[in-house]
A protein has these predicted regions:
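Divalent metal-coordination and catalytic microenvironments
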Residues: 197, 221, 227
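Bulky hydrophobic segments
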Residues: 19-214, 233-379
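Bacterial N-terminal signal peptides
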Residues: 8-17
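Bacterial N-terminal signal peptides that target proteins for export
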Residues: 1-9
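Alpha-helical segment that forms one wall of the substrate-binding/catalytic cleft
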Residues: 224, 228, 232-234
Length: 379
């Protein structure tokens, strides 16, 4: 509770300049298991945005990771990966390839990496930010046309990604409509994140020739994405998304607050947790991008999640979920991510027509069985 108060006060100071006087303070994350927040009105919001340009370079599970290229070790190069809640820098809505390049070169004002929390396990900050951005983007598309049939086309990830929204009659109350649009946007953004894990396992490569299999179904990934969806919805519902600039500054404030609420620890303690799992969840003797540097994966794709259980953690985990229903509307009846056959599907079987979230468990179960077989052969 002290951390919540502390970060509410810090948020007030951060956002009190006249430039951002339209922001209502304080910003407090809603980390109840099921979201409780509702909009009190239809707030001013961003105009229709460009889709996020790719994803931030995220972290393989572990720290001080060695790297190799074409099977040859890269000398004197290590990936630290560990960050702290109070050292995450700024947030920038990721609609430019320059942002990803800056992250790769280590010159970004954003700090991304992994940290450990008592209630949320390991959190990947890049995944939090990416799904927060996707939620804002989808809200900018969904809110102006809520209830109308539309298709939002995203870039390919093995499959053509189409977000199909169905026609329906929205609530008459404006605040209820606004709330429904925010939660529908977070619901769809999480489906986009879940598909990314599947696509990585089946051969998707952001950079051709560089396998991303090491990152597929990493134990912290989808809980981190879910956290990002929840935080973005919280900001939208509190009126903190009237512009990209306002959203960026609000994310800069809410993210550390949420991490402290989850029980974020120091970088030293995060590294200790990694050390305790070395040989079980990851293999410090392997190098990026070897797939089985990561030994533990979480193949569940639901948006009702607990953190992947840490054997040594006695503190209760925090379950988070997205609303499956709001104001009498079932989210699954309002829209879905459709994955149509793409130009290069690698190991992904071609769908009869398209995949949806209903197919995710079977695709993930196949991945789990294949990985288990390969790990058994390695022992």
């Amino acid at each position: 509770m002290l951390n919540v108060v502390k970060y509410g006060l810090i948020t007030g100071i951060l956002l009190s300049s006249s430039c951002f006087s339209q922001i209502k303070l304080p910003i407090v994350p809603d980390l109840s298991t099921s979201p409780l927040q509702q909009a009190t009105r239809a707030w001013p919001t961003v105009e229709m945005l460009s889709a996020p340009d790719g994803l931030r370079p995220c972290c393989a599970f572990g720290y001080n990771l060695k790297a190799q290229a074409l099977g040859i070790p890269v000398p004197l190069y290590q990936l630290n990966n560990v960050v702290e809640a109070d050292g995450l820098g700024e947030h920038h809505y990721n609609d430019s390839l320059l942002g990803a390049v800056a992250n790769l070169m280590g010159i970004s004002s954003e700090q991304d990496g992994l940290l450990y929390t008592a209630h949320g396990g390991f959190i990947d900050i890049a995944h939090v930010r990416d799904t927060a951005d996707m939620t804002l983007f989808l809200f900018s598309q969904i809110w102006p046309r809520l209830g109308q049939e539309q298709t939002i086309v995203l870039s390919e990830e093995l499959a053509q990604r189409h977000i199909q929204l169905f026609a329906f009659t929205p609530p008459q109350n404006e605040a209820e409509r606004f709330t429904l649009a925010a939660y529908l946007s977070s619901y769809m953004a999480f489906q986009v994140a879940a598909w990314h894990e599947i696509a990585q396992w089946y051969g998707f490569e952001s950079v051709p020739g560089f396998s991303e299999g090491i990152s597929a179904f990493s134990p912290e990934d989808l809980y981190s994405n879910l956290l990002g969806a929840r935080l973005a919805a919280s900001l939208i519902l509190q009126g903190h998304s009237s512009s990209v600039e306002q959203f960026n500054l609000s994310m800069q404030a809410i993210l550390p607050a949420a991490l402290h609420q989850l029980g974020a620890v120091s970088a030293k303690d995060t590294r200790f947790q990694f050390d305790m799992l070395d040989g079980n969840w990851w293999d410090s003797h392997r190098a990026v991008p070897e797939k089985f540097l990561v030994l533990k994966r979480n193949y569940l794709t639901d948006d009702d999640r607990i953190p992947t259980p840490i054997p040594s953690e006695s503190t209760a985990s925090l379950r988070l979920r997205l609303p499956a229903e709001w104001a009498g509307f079932q989210m699954k009846d309002l829209g879905e991510l459709r994955l149509l056959s793409g130009r290069s599907m690698k190991q992904l079987p071609k769908p009869d027509e398209y995949y949806t979230f209903r197919d995710f468990p079977a695709l993930a179960l196949h991945a789990r069985a294949e990985d288990a077989g390969q790990l058994a052969e390695m022992k």
